[in-house]
Amino acid sequence: MPYCRIDSDTEIYYMEYGSGDRYVICSQIDHEYTAFSFERELSRRGFHVFLLTDRGFGRSTHTKENYGLGWYDRFADDVIAFADAMGIDRFVYSGASHGSGVGWHLCLRDPERLICFFADVAGPISPEGIPVEGILSGNDVTAENDPNAPAFCSLPDFFYIPTDDQAIIERRRICKEADSTLRASENYKEIFESDDTMRINTGPALIGLRTEEKLREALRTIETPVLMLGGTEDVISTPELMIRTAKCLPHCKLVIHSGFGHVLDIYEELADDAVKFYENVINTGRYYTPVDNTPIEGIR
């Protein structure tokens, strides 16, 4: 299994897909519970993809340390340390949900390392009024719901909006089967639901800003080109939140898909948008297709 040592105490577990120097890095709580993903699809489109597991989770080094409101800063710093260790200078960051939270922190902390950011169901949710006591104390992130519930692997059914597309239905069946297989594996509890892991409460990304006004101010400073991807039925990263974010970002394209929620499992479609976005950024420095002012001759 591939590991990268990023400091004296921490190894990050990662999965690698594709080859070449068009690097995509994604850091999530875990990647193993699903058989498909947007980033894996990108590896079919000529990208060299690294899927990192956040410190404290899964096969990465578990920790007893509580970073309080700084978990996402820690994850972002780990991404940079990983890139340095792998000899990667600039890269695309891609992430979904909490994984996209790492991207927002990278945009604010290390923008010079980013080519662009693929932000999948990325919010970010407003920090306004979110209690921080549980985060600061390191209380179990699942405690307010069900203290015996699995922490982070299975995606809730309400994330998936019903569809009549048989290919998507089959994809979801395969993913549930992969999740069940993972749960039945040897040492599952030790690896994925250790006491140290279950105590982690990261809170949402950018919670340290504390107010909606400060969040918007921070978003307005982001110069990194951002491709935002979302669904009309998402109850977490709602369309309203994503439109708010797009209005703040100076270099952003927002694509919202009808009939999808917090899981956009049309990965081929997302990759189509991402490839075009990336090529525009690389070729022109802008997120949109170059303007062509050549006169168009009509039929006379």
Descriptions of predicted regions:
Residues 222, 228-230:
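Short beta-strand/loop motif that positions the catalytic acidic residue
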Residues 108, 117-155:
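Flexible "cap/lid" loop of the alpha/beta hydrolase fold
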